[in-house]
Amino acid sequence: MSLTKRLLHIHPRCSFSKRSHPSADRNSQPISEALLSQVDKTTENLQLLEIASGSGQHAGFLAPLLPNITFQPTEYERNQFGSIAAYAGDCPTRNIRPPFHVDITRDPGDWEAPPAPASYDYMFNSNMMHISPWSCSIGLFRAAGQLLKKGGRMFTYGPYAQDGILVPQSNVDFDRSLRQRDASWGVRDIKDLKVLAAENGLQLEKLVKMPSNNKFLTWLKL
């Protein structure tokens, strides 16, 4: 059964049309370069879990570049499943699985499709932490601590402060606008994320500065 048919059987009201976000189009190249430089591109049957896949664009442009890695998209908003499936269906390497629902604030054992502990080589999360409550960041690192294999890596992308300093002014303005929209949102400080990492058996391994004042962070599972 095709991916689309399988997902349609589970979610009969899905609309299988690609959604496109300009920001994902813009950051696809730099994210690809940062991720490809840090993953194993030869070992077969590696597994990557993406948290908050959104439209599915990231998996859509990354998976064909890494045919040895199987991508598992997840998303809280079920109305995104059709778009994710559309990107997966067009993937020439056929290494994107059907998405499943994840509330990242919940323990992985309570997810709709609970993964086995230490079952993933990689995790990836883009542009979630600043537009979600702090409880989502807590849950993200908890999931990484439980689901990554020893020596596995979680990659996170987005705007971040460092040791209480947020630059440039455009990021300061962006943070202010986020908090005005929702007091629980806001650009996260890497020093606070390091605390979450340590609590879950991870450490910051690498920081790559990206275009548009974003950063690509690599978290190593110890």
UniProtKB/Swiss-Prot annotation:
* SUPFAM superfamilies to which the protein is assigned, alphabetical: S-adenosyl-L-methionine-dependent methyltransferases
- State one molecular function term (GO): methyltransferase activity
The entry assigns this protein to a family as follows:
Belongs to the UPF0585 family.
What protein name applies here? UPF0585 protein CG18661
Q: What is the lineage of its organism?
A: Eukaryota, Metazoa, Ecdysozoa, Arthropoda, Hexapoda
